[in-house]
């Protein structure tokens, strides 16, 4: 059993559908990325990170009950032929991402996800489960030690988690998942 990333071309994409932090200003923008974010493992939009400002850096989640935020740094237009979206990653330690602290009811669409191949054997099995979200719930949960949230059919009992409410595409045309935060 191993964790596998949701298929994407380069970097993950995020679309904020309805989020409270945009209205309330409950966000982090002046805290640098921790040392775990490198050129080989950059910080991407849609990642869930620890939203505890007292730690001094944006880092992976250490406890599912700590405040959790989603990275939503604005994509860049590199030039008139190369737009951000799937080609944009916040990159490495020392950079300052924008992180919105999740609230119950927040809804977003992303392909920044991972799954356990012990639960979903392959991409096709995962896609079948996501397509049946109306009859068989699929949840989005934090992963201790990883900034990439996980898709699972097992309903969590604590901490922040969301529920899939649509399986379609992200703004760059790749497959994606729309989910709503249902528990904080």
What are these regions (language model features)?
Residues 1-184:
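Surface-exposed, low-hydrophobicity beta-strand/loop segments enriched in small/polar/acidic residues
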């Amino acid at each position: 059993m191993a964790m596998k990333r949701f298929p994407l071309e380069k970097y993950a994409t995020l679309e904020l559908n309805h989020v409270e932090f945009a209205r309330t200003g409950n966000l982090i923008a002046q805290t640098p990325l921790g040392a775990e974010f490198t050129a080989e493992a950059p910080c991407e939009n849609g990642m869930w990170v620890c939203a505890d400002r007292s730690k001094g850096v944006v880092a992976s989640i250490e406890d599912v009950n700590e405040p959790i935020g989603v990275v939503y740094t604005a994509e860049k237009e590199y030039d008139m032929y190369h737009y951000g979206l799937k080609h944009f990653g916040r990159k490495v330690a020392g950079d300052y991402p924008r992180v919105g602290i999740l609230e119950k009811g927040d809804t977003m669409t992303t392909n920044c996800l991972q799954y356990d191949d012990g639960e979903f054997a392959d991409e096709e099995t995962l896609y079948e489960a996501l397509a049946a979200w109306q009859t068989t719930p699929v949840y989005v949960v934090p992963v201790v030690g990883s900034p990439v949230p996980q898709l699972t059919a097992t309903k969590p009992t604590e901490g922040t988690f969301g529920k899939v409410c649509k399986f379609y595409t992200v703004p760059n045309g790749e497959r994606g998942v729309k989910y709503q935060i249902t528990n904080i």
